Amino acid sequence: MKVAVLFLCGVALAAASPSWEHFKGKYGRQYVDAEEDSYRRVIFEQNQKYIEEFNKKYENGEVTFNLAMNKFGDMTLEEFNAVMKGNIPRRSAPVSVFYPKKETGPQATEVDWRTKGAVTPVKDQGQCGSCWAFSTTGSLEGQHFLKTGSLISLAEQQLVDCSRPYGPQGCNGGWMNDAFDYIKANNGIDTEAAYPYEARDGSCRFDSNSVAATCSGHTNIASGSETGLQQAVRDIGPISVTIDAAHSSFQFYSSGVYYEPSCSPSYLDHAVLAVGYGSEGGQDFWLVKNSWATSWGDAGYIKMSRNRNNNCGIATVASYPLV
């Protein structure tokens, strides 16, 4: 899809590079004509140069994470942000709040809910701003498992199609608390098997006979409190969080502990799931599940900086469902 035009002056387009052909083959890219192919190749090569220069900083010990080419390689940062993000202005409503508790004695230094069976495999939202739906199902899947012992993949597509009266706007964004409100009022959410994901807006096809889980409400973590978020992740389970992911460094993250100095604690545009925490190389991190398939990041996950002044706003808007 051609969504913009680059003005190229004095740029000689060389013969197609092997890396470009490899990228197209790996990700099944087919463009409408040679002009768009050339346009996308310029973007790809610019992104490739950015990755190479960033990784030199990693090799020199200047940064704590590295980057790699992925399926977003032919997209500008503006296109990436427009297509892959999915948060809209929040509605304010009364809700219970989880405040950090004063604790004494040693505390768990690491938590990983994947090892306890509370996390479904990494999913793929496709080119649809439905990250909020995946964060919603992820936290509810975890809470349902912890209550019943059964891990069931829940239907993001139902949230995309059916929850608009409660605030979410399908592929144009939404918020997890509004989705929790919908699930509560609807008396449940179907299994993913019964209501498969399509990565597009559709008509509501909810089937009450396929309900797998429900919730009775939700609780917010005290805004901005990484201590509160840590306690919630440790004691409650996987937690829905929202972050500032509007950076090329996030677009091409590969491994290591992600710290972005230009991140905002209040400009939040992407919903993900905090499934644990730990430390690596002296750097505290949050273990975060994304919804961009396993080809992105560290098999679909990212380690985000913890205890560094709420970097990227990971503790600004965090919540979990009550089951």
UniProtKB/Swiss-Prot annotation:
A GO BP term, please?
proteolysis
The catalytic activity of this protein is classed by the Enzyme Commission as: 3.4.22.-
Q: Which UniProt keywords apply?
A: Disulfide bond, Hydrolase, Protease, Signal, Thiol protease, Zymogen
What InterPro entries does this protein map onto?
Papain-like_cys_pep_sf, Pept_asp_AS, Pept_cys_AS, Pept_his_AS, Peptidase_C1A, Peptidase_C1A_C, Peptidase_C1A_papain-like, Prot_inhib_I29
- Judged by the first EC level, this protein's enzyme class is hydrolase
- Catalytic residues, per the record, are 131, 270, 290
- The pro-peptide lies at 17-107
Instruction: State if Disulfide bond is listed as a keyword.
Output: yes
Pfam families the record matches: Inhibitor_I29, Peptidase_C1
Tell me the leader sequence span.
1-16
Which GO terms fall under molecular function for this chain's record?
A: cysteine-type peptidase activity
Which PANTHER family does the record match to this protein? CYSTEINE PROTEASE FAMILY C1-RELATED
Q: What is this protein called?
A: Digestive cysteine proteinase 2
